């Protein structure tokens, strides 16, 4: 009689007909992976038949799991409706209203005058359709094919190919018996003859240990360091500043009024801290305060200017450099993290990286600014770049900078302009002009490396990390040797 390890015996016992291995694993209260070694051993001993079958399955993405928990955007918008007996009215104040409208439009629902107005029966019909879609997302195994295709397009699910392992006993159950597994015998086992009742686990020294891919650096850190190299190669000097910043450098020195909407709590992370903080020089605070009171016509508060925030822009660092260096001809840049209360989605994050730079010198013009921006973009390997007029409180004229993403289309990744006199003169810069810009490096990396979701820049998925590092290596080889130089 053949002696088998207990787990293998249990598999043979339960597999008198073809059965999925994962089903047997559930019965035994173990994982399928833990049984694989015994399956291979059973096949080698001729007591098991093994058949591998392949099937396509659908799994929720991170976004899909979020929608199962919180609801689809269109579902949440419809549930916010105010209804009477005849009609339902939906105000478009929900933060996800634009995304919800895009999906509701496919059902013939369109807004008028900033609201959606539907008859009661149409509302209930549309809501029932969305509820069916919500249930299908939560139960993918029974979801109709057309909804699965829609979920794929919306990146709520992903298609995966699974390998299903089926096993069947190849020997009669009465020809095998379970035994205790032993990897070492004692002298007592040998003397008493008990070793005959044990299953002695064989050692196969020819088996190679499992191969693991070599670790690679994080592709996004490599990208940020490469941007530093490019900027230094273009004649810029790097400066650094604190993440925890006083409002003065983050807002006031940039001519943003103290009642500006960007300084509200829904756009800025305020930090409560009773300890010491670095105060700006008194003469700068007085000069900036005078400009605010003269131009914006309100009573400027030095106490508010000393409140602490997590910096919302790295311009706080370049404006510090401008205040320290004053007049002259120089170029500086900084790369750092900034923080804003954004809702996390494929294009937005509450924490991201900015490249901020300034060029200081007499006689600089808007043409110089656009030329400098285009030169940096080309040095980083961007294809098509375009500019659109924009408004920022501290620059004039101003532009937004766009680049073409392979799948997302034109993506805005930065703003730029010439610092207004209200910014430069209180800092003592009266004869030079200052070209300034801030770029979102997370979006730049997405454009250059073909990444569709900003959250993937910080993914823990090892397969994705290796894939993106391979893209980074290809990008660096193709762009990193151009050696573009630019002088201004």
Swiss-Prot record:
Its main location: cytoplasm. Binds 2 magnesium ions per tetramer. It catalyses: tRNA(Phe) + L-phenylalanine + ATP = L-phenylalanyl-tRNA(Phe) + AMP + diphosphate + H(+). Gene3D superfamilies: 1.10.10.2320, 1.10.10.2330, 3.30.1370.240, Bira Bifunctional Protein, Domain 2. GO terms for molecular function: ATP binding; magnesium ion binding; phenylalanine-tRNA ligase activity; tRNA binding. PROSITE patterns: AA_TRNA_LIGASE_II (PS50862). GO terms for biological process: phenylalanyl-tRNA aminoacylation. CDD domains: PheRS_alpha_core (cd00496). Its EC number is 6.1.1.20. It is an enzyme of class 6 (ligase). The keyword Aminoacyl-tRNA synthetase applies. L-phenylalanine binds at residues 315, 354-356, 394, 419. Pfam families: tRNA-synt_2d. One of its GO terms (cellular component) is cytoplasm. Its cofactor is Mg(2+). It is found in: Cytoplasm. Keywords: Aminoacyl-tRNA synthetase, ATP-binding, Cytoplasm, Ligase, Magnesium, Metal-binding, Nucleotide-binding, Protein biosynthesis. Belongs to the class-II aminoacyl-tRNA synthetase family. Phe-tRNA synthetase alpha subunit type 2 subfamily. Tetramer of two alpha and two beta subunits. PANTHER family: PHENYLALANINE--TRNA LIGASE ALPHA SUBUNIT, PHENYLALANYL-TRNA SYNTHETASE. This is Phenylalanine--tRNA ligase alpha subunit. It comes from Pyrobaculum calidifontis (strain DSM 21063 / JCM 11548 / VA1).
């Amino acid at each position: 009689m053949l002696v088998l390890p207990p787990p293998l015996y249990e598999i043979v016992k339960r597999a008198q007909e073809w059965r999925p291995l994962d089903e047997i694993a559930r019965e035994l209260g173990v994982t399928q992976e833990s049984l694989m070694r015994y399956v291979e051993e059973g096949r080698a001993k001729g007591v098991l038949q093994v058949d591998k079958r392949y099937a396509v399955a659908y799994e929720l993405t991170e976004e899909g799991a979020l929608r199962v928990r919180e609801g689809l955007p269109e579902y949440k918008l419809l549930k916010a409706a105010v209804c009477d007996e005849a009609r339902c009215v939906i105000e478009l104040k929900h933060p996800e209203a634009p995304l919800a409208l895009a999906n509701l439009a496919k059902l013939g629902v369109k807004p008028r005058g900033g609201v959606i107005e539907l008859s009661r029966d149409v509302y209930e019909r549309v809501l029932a359709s969305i509820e069916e879609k919500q249930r299908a997302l939560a139960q993918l195994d029974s979801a109709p094919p057309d909804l699965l295709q829609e979920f794929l397009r919306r990146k709520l699910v992903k298609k995966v190919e699974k390998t299903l392992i089926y096993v069947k006993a190849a020997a009669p159950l009465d020809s095998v018996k379970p035994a205790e597994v032993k990897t070492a015998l004692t002298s007592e086992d040998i003397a008493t003859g008990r070793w005959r009742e044990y299953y002695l686990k064989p050692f196969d020294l020819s088996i190679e240990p499992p191969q693991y891919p070599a670790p690679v650096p994080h592709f996004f850190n490599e990208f940020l360091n490469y941007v530093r190299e490019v900027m230094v190669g273009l004649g810029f000097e790097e400066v650094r500043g604190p993440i925890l910043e006083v409002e003065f450098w983050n807002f006031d020195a940039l001519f943003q009024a103290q009642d500006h909407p960007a300084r509200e709590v829904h756009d800025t992370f305020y930090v409560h801290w009773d300890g010491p903080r670095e105060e700006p020089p008194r003469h700068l605070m007085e000069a900036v305060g005078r400009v605010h009171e003269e131009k914006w016509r309100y009573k400027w508060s030095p106490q508010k200017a000393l409140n602490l925030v997590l910096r919302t822009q790295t311009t706080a660092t370049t404006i510090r450099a401008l205040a320290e260096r004053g007049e002259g001809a120089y170029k500086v840049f900084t790369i750092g993290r900034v923080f804003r209360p954004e809702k996390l989605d494929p294009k937005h994050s509450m924490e991201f990286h900015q490249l901020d730079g300034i060029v200081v010198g007499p006689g600089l013009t808007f043409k110089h600014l656009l030329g400098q921006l285009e030169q940096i973009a080309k040095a980083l390997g961007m294809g098509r770049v375009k500019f659109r007029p924009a408004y920022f409180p501290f620059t004039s004229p101003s532009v937004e900078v766009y680049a073409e993403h392979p799948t997302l289309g034109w993506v805005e990744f930065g703003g730029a302009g010439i610092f207004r006199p209200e910014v430069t003169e209180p800092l003592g810069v009266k004869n030079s002009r200052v070209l300034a810009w801030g770029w979102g490096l997370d979006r730049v990396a997405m454009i250059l490396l073909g990444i569709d979701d900003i959250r993937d820049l910080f993914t823990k998925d090892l397969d994705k990390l290796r894939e993106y590092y391979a893209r980074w290596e290809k990008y660096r080889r193709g762009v990193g040797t151009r050696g573009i130089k630019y002088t201004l």
